[in-house]
Amino acid sequence: MKIKEVVCALERFAPLPLQDGFDNAGLQIGLTEAEATGALLCLDVTEAVLDEAIALGYNLVISHHPLIFKGYKSITGRDYVEHCIMKAIKNDIVIYSAHTNLDNAPGGVNFKIAEKIGLSNVCLLYTSDA
């Protein structure tokens, strides 16, 4: 399966328009034409997560929290985000994040939490542009 097919499946379940205005969900780094050799799921992208993906031979990391929230004028390795960006690119690892779009999706994170604590008649009251 190509990485772009994984991305399409994720976005069918949790469409990007469901993300809050502050968010940066979606494709973070990489090209999606390659065949997926494996996917590592995580809450946050860290160097340890990328090291594990490299050790396993996986070329896709799917995180809940986006690695990149702000624009960068240069990538020089001055912080952990830049280190992760450089490591992912150097090792041909695609990073995809499903954050508030997954939280807000019907059947997504918030709905699963409601289900686990026994709530019924759950619906999304509003979407936020905050």
Which sequence ranges carry the predicted segments?
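Active-site loop-to-helix "anion-binding N-cap" substructures in soluble metabolic enzymes
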Residues: 3-17, 21-24, 28-60, 67-122
